[in-house]
């Protein structure tokens, strides 16, 4: 006689975030002597591994999360999937940088090795959370079959610096909101965000130190253009993505638009400590154009309209040419 056993099916999900690669030989040639002391200090902080025992699941996870209403569960699954894939992407990049730089630039290699450790820890923790909702990522498959986007080394540093800093502000903002309003903490992963975000912050500081070791990357007219470009790219990407996922933020008691503007302003303030210019994110036209861009993007997703796509690019151009804020003169006074 056969016994019927009801099991939960775990779906292997393949996502489509960006995975990056770069010119490792060129990166190996970079001279970091101009800011070596700061880089060494940050690597020493990495060695201490403050979060070694932080990412351990406790009894709060021991619930049947698949009984959550399907609409809510779907938003959580997507949040966890996107977060896990982003962390895993960072792990792959940092691990490869550590391996390639081991012989030519051992200090940077050590720093990237510690950051890959952190990212792997984050990705693994998120993947376990995904299993609570009946989903998991085949990280080995992702490693072998992902398409990689090539970025020149200095662009990798701009992009990852901002990615880590915006990640810090996202995590700490969610944590502080739920700490103040615990009734919205509907899943226990958020209580880990306070220490988790410190990993992101330290990673951002490491990239900032590398950028400062190459003064031409943060001074001069070309660097001003590139800093504006990457700031705008990161802010617009987050804004368009999050406004498409308002329901998730409502689940945890946040307004997606207000949350994003807070994160944008805080990340812009952080970047002002490093970049020679930042965006005037409080300019009335900046706010208006961001909203117009989001509306055009939502319409394009529904219709694939060429006019909507043209509207998006027009908004992006207008956003880019808004006069930036000169921060270089304030570097010695910003706290």
From Swiss-Prot:
The keyword NADP applies. It catalyses: Mg-protoporphyrin IX 13-monomethyl ester + 3 NADPH + 3 O2 + 2 H(+) = 3,8-divinyl protochlorophyllide a + 3 NADP(+) + 5 H2O. Its EC number is 1.14.13.81. CDD domains: ACSF. Keywords: Chlorophyll biosynthesis, Chloroplast, Iron, Metal-binding, NADP, Oxidoreductase, Photosynthesis, Plastid. It is an enzyme of class 1 (oxidoreductase). Pathway: Porphyrin-containing compound metabolism; chlorophyll biosynthesis (light-independent). It is found in: Plastid, Chloroplast. One of its GO terms (cellular component) is chloroplast thylakoid membrane. Its cofactor is Fe cation. GO terms for molecular function: iron ion binding; magnesium-protoporphyrin IX monomethyl ester (oxidative) cyclase activity; mRNA binding. GO terms for biological process: chloroplast organization; light-independent chlorophyll biosynthetic process; photosynthesis; regulation of tetrapyrrole metabolic process. NCBIfam families: AcsF (TIGR02029), PRK13654.1 (NF010172). Belongs to the AcsF family. Catalyzes the formation of the isocyclic ring in chlorophyll biosynthesis. Mediates the cyclase reaction, which results in the formation of divinylprotochlorophyllide (Pchlide) characteristic of all chlorophylls from magnesium-protoporphyrin IX 13-monomethyl ester (MgPMME). This is Magnesium-protoporphyrin IX monomethyl ester [oxidative] cyclase. It comes from Cyanidioschyzon merolae (strain NIES-3377 / 10D) (Unicellular red alga). The lineage of its organism: Eukaryota, Rhodophyta, Bangiophyceae, Cyanidiales, Cyanidiaceae.
